[in-house]
Amino acid sequence: MKFLDEAKVYIRSGDGGGGSVSFRREKFIEFGGPDGGDGGRGGDVWVETVNGLNTLIDFRFQQHFKATIGTHGMGRNRTGANGSDVTLKVPVGTQIFEEDRETLICDLTVEGQRYCLAHGGNGGFGNAHFKTSTNQAPDWANPGLPGEEKTLWLRLKLIADAGLVGMPNAGKSTFLASVTRARPKIANYPFTTLHPNLGVATIDEREFILADIPGLIEGAHEGVGIGDRFLGHVERTRVLLHLVSAQEEKVGKAYKTVKHELEAYGNELTDKPEIVALSQIDVLDEAELKKKTKELAKACGKTPFQISAVTGKGMTEVLRALRDIIVEENAEEKPAKVPKQRHRDIVVADEGEDVGEDGADDQP
């Protein structure tokens, strides 16, 4: 399945049905009076997170979503049927923005979370509502209120426990493929990875999710290379695994380049716990390995792990280090709860009238 992390959609909730103008007509009842029913409420447009999705590709083929209108009221005080709701199914981690792409509407981080993006219009009052002591036979009714129409942007930030960062050809995809069942594209040229990949790693019977993003080069925050547009996918991670290829001529400079790009991107990425590893060490002899390990340690201020996805050396130790930090971070954070948003009570008002949720002002 192709990966898409941003999509534009057009939504419209349903219009409310019009109220009915009707009078009771029965044999031997001379003055039956008005009995026009209210119109039905228009359908809402909802967004809901579901399990099993990690892309917004479906919204490339369908961008328009429209709920149905409420039906008109009928005689004998019959209320029209409500319109059917429309629900957009999105992956966990999806954010919804206004058309300006900056105003955040909601951030959906829990499976099963729902949010109403557009409320349907209220149905109009039937003429039975307008009967008074001085007007026993009103011959008018309220039209239904129009629904809401919006243009929105959907932006996906993948939910993962650990994020892999580094320069192109640092061995991130090879690492992911060796410790998970993910099968990212692997080749010996820069920018083989063009979109994020996810995989589930297991160590000592504990599972956690790894996210591999395309490599960063100098100037990525200014759009050089693929740029930093995929860094949003590691914003939610607990820890970053920074891989530096042992094939780099200057491993210290390679580390600092990526670190600078993370700082330029912002969003507290550099505040996350970081594990540094010298990867692809199987290509070095002992003397060269010792030299580059010392150089990298000086640049990052800590002793880096030495790993090789080909031989398996150091892989278990790195996974355990990742697991320990993830467990510690999860223990400090309270479990997330699904925010609840209840349906509005059905209220009907004249156009332009302010109506509260409790329907206290629903009289015309």
From Swiss-Prot:
Which residues fall in a compositionally biased region of kind Acidic residues? 348-364
OBG-type G domain: residues covered: 160-327
Cofactor(s) needed for function: Mg(2+)
Q: So where does GTP get bound?
A: 166-173, 191-195, 212-215, 279-282, 308-310
Segments for region (Disordered) = 330-364
Q: Which InterPro entries match?
A: G_OBG, GTP-bd, GTP-bd_Obg/CgtA, GTP1-OBG_CS, GTP1_OBG_dom, GTP1_OBG_dom_sf, OBG_GTPase, P-loop_NTPase
Q: Where does Mg(2+) bind?
A: S173, T193
Molecular function (GO) terms for this protein are: GTP binding; GTPase activity; magnesium ion binding
Tell me the keywords, alphabetical order. Cytoplasm, GTP-binding, Hydrolase, Magnesium, Metal-binding, Nucleotide-binding
Q: Which residues form the Obg domain?
A: 1-159
List the GO biological process terms. ribosome biogenesis
Query: Looking at the Swiss-Prot or TrEMBL record, what is one Pfam family this protein matches?
Result: GTP1_OBG
Compartmental location: Cytoplasm
Q: Which E.C. number(s) belong to this protein?
A: 3.6.5.-
**Principal localisation:** cytoplasm
Kindly list the GO CC terms recorded for this protein: cytoplasm
- What is the enzyme's main class? hydrolase
User: Which family does the UniProt entry place this protein in?
Assistant: Belongs to the TRAFAC class OBG-HflX-like GTPase superfamily. OBG GTPase family.
Instruction: Say what the protein does.
Output: An essential GTPase which binds GTP, GDP and possibly (p)ppGpp with moderate affinity, with high nucleotide exchange rates and a fairly low GTP hydrolysis rate. Plays a role in control of the cell cycle, stress response, ribosome biogenesis and in those bacteria that undergo differentiation, in morphogenesis control.
Check the record and name the NCBIfam families matching this protein: Obg_CgtA (TIGR02729), PRK12297.1 (NF008955), PRK12299.1 (NF008956), small_GTP (TIGR00231)
Put simply, this protein is called GTPase Obg
